[in-house]
Amino acid sequence: YDAQMDEESLGNWVREKSIIAGTEIFEEERVERFTSRGEITSSRFGRRQYDVIVNAAGPWAAQLNENNEISTKFYLRLIRGSHLILDHQVSGSYLFQEHQDGRVVFILPYLGKTLVGTTEVSQLLSENTICTEEERQYLLNVYNSNFKRHVSNSNIISEFSGLRPIVASHLRSKESYFSVASREAETEVVDKLITVYGGKWTSAPSLSEKVVRKLKSKEFL
């Protein structure tokens, strides 16, 4: 169905393709520090020098640069989106625009169950990325407002939340909700450091090509 994806499976597919292409992946490896001069200090390898560093850490990209005293002209707003998995499967796929706030909420068949999402809540990196009771009731109310069969907390078999990094300059103060803001990414080059701000799965291939072009233009490769 349109409007849904299995990002975990897609991420694992990309990971496996990267390994086949010769990429070394170090999971749960803490980077203690990095500089715009290409230096990285990690708990496993100590200090190492690289031709280029690409900071593509998603919601953490801006905070990592700030922690390493690297100035930037871009900042991120983090928007939490929460989803519910209900214990039955709806007969079709639906997109509803809520009259109260104008947001779009989807209700879709998902692995034999029903997926309901998403919310839009601004949050900080220091906060837990979890579905709150307020979000839970919001999504249940959307469902119950559009279907004869009503559901409650007892029908929820799973829930998950994620963060959308949105470049702050893409938000306009007059916007009443975040989904109308541009999800396009920005890239910034500071010496030997390239940082990716924002972005999304659907534009990831073109974004990676853009980063490679920047690498070549700076004669890193």
Tell me the role of every PLM-derived stretch:
Residues 43-52, 56:
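Core beta-strand elements of the Rossmann-like FAD/NAD(P) dinucleotide-binding domain
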Residues 25-39:
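A conserved short coil-to-beta-strand element within the FAD-binding core of flavoproteins
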Residues 12, 16-17, 21, 28-31, ...:
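Flavin (primarily FAD) cofactor-binding/catalytic cores of flavoenzymes
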Residues 33, 60-62, 92, 122:
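Glycine-rich nucleotide phosphate-binding loop and flanking beta-alpha elements
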Residues 22-24, 193:
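Short, conserved active-site loop motifs that form the nucleotide-linked donor/cofactor pocket
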Residues 71-115, 121-221:
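C-terminal catalytic lobe of FAD-dependent flavoproteins
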Residues 55-70:
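Flavin (primarily FAD) binding-site architecture
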Residues 1-16, 26, 129-134, 197-206:
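Short beta-strand to alpha-helix junction loop
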